[in-house]
Amino acid sequence: MTGKTKVLVLYHSSYGHIETLAKAVAEGAASQAGTEVLLKRVPETMPADAMANAGMKVEQEAPVATPQELGDYDAVIFGTPTRFGNMTGQMRTFLDQTGGLWAKGALVGKVGSVFTSTGTGGGNETTITSFHTNLFHHGMVVVGLPYSVGTELFDISEVRGGSPYGASTLAGGDGKRQPTEKELSLARKQGAHVASIAAKLKA
């Protein structure tokens, strides 16, 4: 197969932390030669007034994706906040609409990867690993963030998100903590790694 490697960074963000990580992931993927990257979000199911009352980020510039388009990409990198150790309802609703893709095997052999954010660390890893189950059912090739790629994973000099499962950030109980440069670096490296693997599988 020829042509550019197409990577979709698909996310849901409540307070902007995942949106920030998603942009870093997309930047990393775009750093790989021959890669075309799109940044999109899943539809928001929460009413705008309820979001505003909760202090959530209502306006986000990324266009909204449709479940049907996932098969158009060589890799999809999913980003979701944590809700009780799992993905958000918005992301769940989106994935629940991919049954038609599953029936056709449209995602078999595509690369899938996940990044997340948590308030204080609870569910940081379970959100990613439980998300992987969905990717396995679709026959996707699951890619994480190896220590050999994300060398910041060895650094314990400060509190940070990120693991071999994928990039992440700790937002804090009040959501005021923003992704650090180390967390953003890991996100970029995850994007680059996924794009590299997808290109090799496409070749």
Swiss-Prot record:
UniProt cross-references to PANTHER family, sorted A to Z: FLAVODOXIN-RELATED PROTEIN WRBA-RELATED, FLAVOPROTEIN-LIKE PROTEIN YCP4-RELATED
Keywords: Flavoprotein, FMN, NAD, NADP, Nucleotide-binding, Oxidoreductase
PROSITE patterns reported in the protein's UniProt record: FLAVODOXIN_LIKE
NCBIfam families according to UniProt: flav_wrbA, PRK03767.1
Protein name: NAD(P)H dehydrogenase (quinone)
InterPro entries attached to this UniProt entry: Flavodoxin/NO_synth, Flavoprotein-like_sf, Flavoprotein_WrbA-like, FMN_Rdtase-like_dom, NQO
Positions of the Flavodoxin-like domain: 7-194
Binding residue positions for substrate: W102
Catalyses which reaction(s): a quinone + NADH + H(+) = a quinol + NAD(+); a quinone + NADPH + H(+) = a quinol + NADP(+)
Organism (species): Parvibaculum lavamentivorans (strain DS-1 / DSM 13023 / NCIMB 13966)
Gene Ontology cellular component annotations, sorted alphabetically: membrane
Family to which this protein belongs: Belongs to the WrbA family.
Ligand binding (FMN): 13-18, 82-84, 117-122, 137
One Pfam family linked to the record: FMN_red
Record flagged with keyword Cytoplasm: no
GO MF term set: flavin adenine dinucleotide binding; FMN binding; NAD binding; NADH:ubiquinone reductase (non-electrogenic) activity; NADP binding; NADPH dehydrogenase (quinone) activity
Cofactors that this protein relies on: FMN
